[in-house]
From Swiss-Prot:
Lipid-linked residues (S-diacylglycerol cysteine): 19
Protein name: Uncharacterized lipoprotein YpdI
Topology term for the membrane: Lipid-anchor
Record's subcellular location: Cell membrane
Signal sequence range: 1-18
Origin species: Escherichia coli (strain K12)
Lipid-acceptor residues (N-palmitoyl cysteine): 19
Domain of life: Bacteria
Keyword Cell membrane assigned: yes
Keywords assigned: Cell membrane, Lipoprotein, Membrane, Palmitate, Signal
Lineage, opening ranks: Bacteria, Pseudomonadati, Pseudomonadota, Gammaproteobacteria, Enterobacterales
GO biological process assignments: colanic acid biosynthetic process
GO CC, alphabetical: plasma membrane
Length: 91
């Protein structure tokens, strides 16, 4: 009984580790190339470089042209606030 429990827990541990390794290899995580790309893009955003990719330039343009947010203005909620039905307690 004790040996079965040890073998089962060992099998469970190995299968969980195998699933993690498999998922990690599918996602392509941990590659040196992806690390260098993220390092480059983070450096671009922190130094406000003008060398933007076309997709980044479009996003930046949209952000720049967006109207300023007015957080002090009262806006009605998009849903009714008062219930028009009665909630009966469960008996």
């Amino acid at each position: 009984m004790k040996v079965n429990l040890i073998l089962f827990s060992l099998f469970l541990l190995v299968s969980i580790m195998a699933c993690n390794v498999f998922a990690f290899s599918i996602s392509g995580g941990g590659s040196e190339r992806s690390y260098k790309e993220t390092e480059k893009t983070s450096a671009m955003t922190t130094t406000h470089s003008t060398k933007l990719q076309p997709s980044q330039a479009i996003l930046f343009k949209m952000r720049e042209d967006a109207p300023p947010l007015n957080l002090t203005e009262e806006m009605p909620p998009p849903f009714p606030t008062k219930a028009n039905y009665l909630i009966h307690p469960v008996r």
